[in-house]
Amino acid sequence: MAKESSFDIVSKVDLAEVTNAINIAMKEIKTRYDFKGSKSDISLEKDELVLISDDEFKLEQLKDVLIGKLIKRGVATKNIQYGKIEPASGGTVRQRAKLVQGIDKDNAKKINTIIKSTGLKVKSQVQDDQIRVSGKSKDDLQKVIAAIREADLPIDVQFVNYR
């Protein structure tokens, strides 16, 4: 068993599921009594959500509805970074939320320290926005996956290309 096994650690958001969640949330917003006559809207612009509503209270309710729909669709809400609430045209307020795709340098360092702290015989290398972990023992790789899942990371990670 000289062949090395490996897997990749990635952080991705499925934009199709986000679009579906937005559509379902907007359908609910249009039928809810407390949003009747409201100028509430959720849109997706490239990798950024734009939430618009009449006031901050309704914006928070809009956000709660969206988060509920995202969770039901299996989209990680950890990968959404909300910006400041800013005034928009027509007496409304707007909030932008960035969808985080990929693992940045800081989070890659955190993940690497978690891997190193396990003391297992595995190698990890940062490749652009993902981390490749390789080792001879598949059991060691499984233990690394378990250690990363237990860690409290600021982003949601997925494990792909397990060979």
Swiss-Prot record:
Pfam families referenced in this protein's UniProt entry, alphabetically: DUF520
Cellular component GO terms held in the UniProt record: cytosol
Disulfide bonds: none
A molecular-function term among this protein's GO annotations: nucleotide binding
This protein's UniProt keywords: Nucleotide-binding
Protein family (similarity comment): Belongs to the YajQ family.
PANTHER family: UPF0234 PROTEIN YAJQ
Function per UniProt: Nucleotide-binding protein.
HAMAP family for the chain: YajQ (MF_00632)
Protein name: Nucleotide-binding protein GTNG_0630
